[in-house]
Each structure stands twice: as C-alpha cells, then as structure tokens.
C-alpha cells in the first residue's frame, strides 16, 4: 500500500510538472502585477499579512488536494527530506545479493541546508572525531545568541546536536553555514539551553581534528538495497542493528552479529566501535541493508586500542573488507 501511494504521488507530481510546461504562460510576472494592482484594499492587507505568494492550483478536486498536501509538506524540513527520497527510486527491496543503488545523495546536507565555504586539506571529520571549532549561533533574524571556540567529540552534542552533524565531512580550514531545525537544537549541556521551538542559523569554522584517521569519500563505496522516505540517522543518535564483516580476498567472515544472536546497540560516534560504523550509519535511512566496501584500516576504533567488534591485531588493514549493516531499530 505504501509503495502504491508513493507511486501515485510521484505520478501526480510529474503530471502537474508536464501540465505547467505545456500550458500557456498565463501567470507571467506582468499579468500577476496587473492583477494585484486591481485587487481590493482588503486583498492587499491580507497579502501584506501573508508574505507567501498565492499559488493557483489547476486540475480536479483530487489533484488540487494532493497539490496542497505537497506544498504544505515542502514547508517542513521532514517534508523536504521526504521528497528528496521519493524522487530517487521508489523504496522496495531488490535482489539482496545485487547492491546496485549507489548512495550519492547526502540527505543530511539537505536537512540542514549546509553551504560549505573555503577549502582545506586535512580531514574529513567523521562522527567520533575530536574537533576544535569556532561557531556562531543566531536566531532566524540574525541576532547573535552564542559564539565560542570549543573542543569536543562529534556525537557528544555539548552545544547542539545539529551542530555536530553540520561539522561532519568538513576539512580543517573550511567554514560552513547552515540552518538547524528546532528538533535538533537539543544538547547534553546544562549550561547551554536553546528553545526547541525555533530554528537557528549556524556558522562554524573547523580548526583541528584528532586523531588524524580519516575515511576518504573516494576510497569508500556505499550501496543500499532499499530506499525509503524517512529522516536519516544522525551523529549522536542511538540505533540497534546487525553487522557482518567479510574479507573480500577469500570470502572469510570476520564478524557476524546475527550469527552470535545479539544485535549491536550503538550510539553513532562511539569511539570504541570501528570508525567505519559511524561513517556508514550517519545519514542512513533505517530500512534495508547498507553495504560498505572499505579498507581494513577504516575498521579501527578511534578510542586507543579498544575495539568492541574486532581486535586491531586481527584486522587486515591493507585489504578491502565488506561491511553489511541491517535490521535497524532506532532507540
């Protein structure tokens, strides 16, 4: 039923786009301005109160109703993430042995409206890294609320959970500007409190990353066997899942939580788990199986010699391994 509704919505969206493309341009700016100038004073007052432009909807009652739902949904961050997803292939499992949907879309960047400025050559920062940043947080009217230089572990959310996720992927020296939706303004500090009823603007500059163990985007391949319209997992959130690690050179299974009969319960960014786990989980929608091909060195944990999954001594660090993550349950 969910797939059918998704298909209907996508068809209606495409249908309306085609109608707009082939229909005469009766709503050009000049016509709109002329019509507006002839409106009554009551209409002008109403327009001044509501700054959003009026959208004329065509079609039958059902088409207009669906169009209104789509427009209202796109006004929310979750709604935008929803449509970012359904405009990719419709969610549905494919052959579990044939991972053909390569992950290219970063839903986290869409969710936080991230804009990157400048460049750097050290990084990128992953969930679990210790970073030093300079940040500024303002309200949506650009009134400065907080600014500081702070060192913390990504995922610990000492300032704002959304800030941690904006920093993910940054290089040292880069700057980013973003908008943090209200629900991600939470933190684990008793000294910093933000009203979770409002969105916030963030500017951040990355000054340093420790340790300098990095997962390079061009050295890792990530595939999903299913795509769905949900808000993705974020750095600092908790999730349960099954994991399987296979050595590609000979097919030897190095770890399998399902065979052990116990799911992994992990906070994304936990430095006692392999770095590649946090890298692969951040931004993942909790359906299907995510398959990751990466070098063994990325399976090291950031926290000294502690690795809850596989000992560093037994890791083939210079070989490629296959990591499979599935059976997700968000805590």
Curated annotation (Swiss-Prot):
It is an enzyme of class 5 (isomerase). It comes from the Bacteria. Keywords: Isomerase, Rotamase. This is Putative peptidyl-prolyl cis-trans isomerase RF_0616. Its EC number is 5.2.1.8. GO terms for biological process: protein folding. Transmembrane segments: none annotated. The keyword Isomerase applies. Residues 28-50 are annotated as: Disordered. SUPFAM superfamilies: FKBP-like (SSF54534). The keyword Aminoacyl-tRNA synthetase does not apply. GO terms for molecular function: peptidyl-prolyl cis-trans isomerase activity. InterPro entries: PPIase_dom_sf, PPIase_FKBP_dom. Gene3D superfamilies: 3.10.50.40. It catalyses: [protein]-peptidylproline (omega=180) = [protein]-peptidylproline (omega=0). Residues 128-226 form the PPIase FKBP-type domain. PROSITE patterns: FKBP_PPIASE (PS50059).
